[in-house]
């Protein structure tokens, strides 16, 4: 996120509530609201929210391929600059998602580090 007087980054928020995840790792409406507040703290504007319920995370894209496509459509339609995931992503998942979504991708931990940088 940029904290200078440059263009405010528009963020798409995404999360996964997988049955195979520990309860504290699952995204919920409450955790996505907290994520939106973190984005605002970092100087961004949350404009899109997507929550997927799925048995297990996709090892390649974390969300299912259909949800990744839906998120991409929402990112384009809402002129988003950034996608922020409520869950921890692996470096390879972040790389694949950046390629698929066409925007910078952060997870919750990366966003928090960005706030305190």
Predicted feature residues:
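N-terminal accessory targeting/assembly segments
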Residues: 1-114
């Amino acid at each position: 996120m940029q904290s200078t007087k440059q263009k405010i980054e528009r963020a798409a928020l995404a999360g996964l509530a997988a049955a195979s995840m520990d309860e504290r790792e699952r995204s919920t409406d409450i955790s996505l609201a907290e994520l939106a507040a973190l984005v605002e703290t970092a100087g961004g504007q949350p404009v899109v929210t997507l929550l997927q319920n799925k048995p297990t995370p996709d090892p390649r894209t974390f969300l299912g391929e259909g949800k990744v496509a839906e998120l991409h459509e929402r990112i384009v339609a809402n002129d988003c600059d950034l996608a922020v995931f409520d869950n921890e992503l692996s470096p390879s998942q972040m790389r694949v998602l950046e390629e698929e979504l066409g925007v910078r991708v952060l997870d919750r931990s990366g966003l928090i580090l960005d706030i305190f940088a």
